[in-house]
């Protein structure tokens, strides 16, 4: 089973290790919230696996390269997400190339995010990151714009396996970034055993956010529309015991999709 992380508000910081297998840190929040920064600085000191994200999804664009580099030096995650631009293949590869040429640190492992308009462009991203020896390759939930975000990653992986798998460059380790509906992971779990074995980790705040808004995950995922709330905008939310109970129920259900 892949390693799972669910981003959490401060009210659940003391239960982080019940929620997540590893810390997933939003880079832009480290300079905005001292409590968040202090908590994750301590977490990253002992984590065997950790991700410091460039916050492109939250901000609309990655935090500046120099800032990302400095955060990597200060917080020392095992993996740093290279700068990307949502749904922009050319700029994502230009940004990744610039960062690796100007800021690459020996011993620091990186995650490269695939962006593009077609499966072919996503596959080209994978090939580039493999050639650059980027350790993990991330597939965002909105992999191809205006596609069915519940099925697009499973469809892509099946296409990639049939058309681009094992072309002599090497095999990737995949990270799945976010989700539209957690039921997607039932589809992911139905992939062939080789593809499932390439999925190293995933992150999503879905069980947490749906829990606090009152949505219960069922056998077919989320039947309500995806909440518009983002974890980064709700760090200080206060949670009732009823909300906490539903969050943990959702987390248990989510893991049943993945296992």
Question: Which residues are covered by each model-predicted region?
Answer:
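Active-site beta-loop-alpha junctions enriched in small/polar residues
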Residues: 5-11, 30-31, 54-57, 84-87, ...
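Short, well-ordered alpha-helical microsegments
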Residues: 12-13, 33-37, 119-123, 153, ...
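Conserved, mostly hydrophobic/aromatic
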Residues: 53, 112, 129, 188
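Alpha/beta enzyme core
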Residues: 74, 117-142
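Distinct, well-ordered alpha-helical segments
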Residues: 63-64, 91-99, 119-130, 147-160, ...
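Non-catalytic, usually N-terminal nucleic-acid engagement modules in DNA/RNA processing proteins
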Residues: 1-104, 193
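Alpha/beta catalytic cores of nucleotide-metabolism and tRNA/nucleoside-modifying enzymes
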Residues: 1-14, 66-72, 81, 90, ...
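Short, well-ordered coil/turn segments that N-cap beta-strands
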Residues: 22, 46-50, 76-78, 106-110, ...
């Amino acid at each position: 089973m892949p390693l799972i992380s669910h981003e959490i508000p401060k009210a659940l910081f003391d239960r982080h290790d019940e929620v997540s297998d590893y810390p997933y840190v939003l880079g832009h929040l480290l300079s905005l919230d001292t409590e968040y920064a202090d908590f994750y600085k301590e977490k990253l000191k002992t984590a065997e696996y950790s991700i410091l994200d460039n916050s492109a999804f939250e901000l609309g664009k990655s935090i500046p390269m120099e800032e990302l580099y400095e955060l990597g030096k200060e917080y020392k995650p095992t993996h740093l997400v290279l700068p990307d631009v949502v749904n922009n293949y050319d700029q994502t590869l230009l940004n990744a190339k610039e960062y690796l040429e100007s800021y690459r640190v020996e011993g620091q492992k990186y995650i490269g995010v695939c962006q593009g308009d077609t499966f072919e462009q996503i596959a080209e991203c994978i090939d580039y990151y493999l050639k650059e020896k980027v350790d993990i390759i991330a597939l965002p939930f909105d992999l191809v714009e205006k596609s069915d975000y519940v099925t697009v990653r499973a469809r892509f992986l099946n296409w990639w396996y049939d058309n681009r798998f094992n072309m002599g460059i090497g095999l990737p380790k995949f990270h799945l970034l976010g989700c539209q509906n957690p039921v997607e992971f039932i589809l992911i779990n139905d992939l062939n055993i080789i593809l499932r074995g390439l999925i190293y980790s995933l992150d999503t705040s879905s069980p947490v956010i749906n829990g606090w808004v009152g949505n219960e995950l069922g056998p077919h995922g989320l039947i309500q529309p995806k909440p518009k709330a983002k974890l980064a905008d709700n760090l200080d939310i206060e949670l009732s015991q009823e909300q906490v109970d539903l969050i943990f129920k959702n987390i248990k259900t989510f893991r049943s999709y993945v296992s």
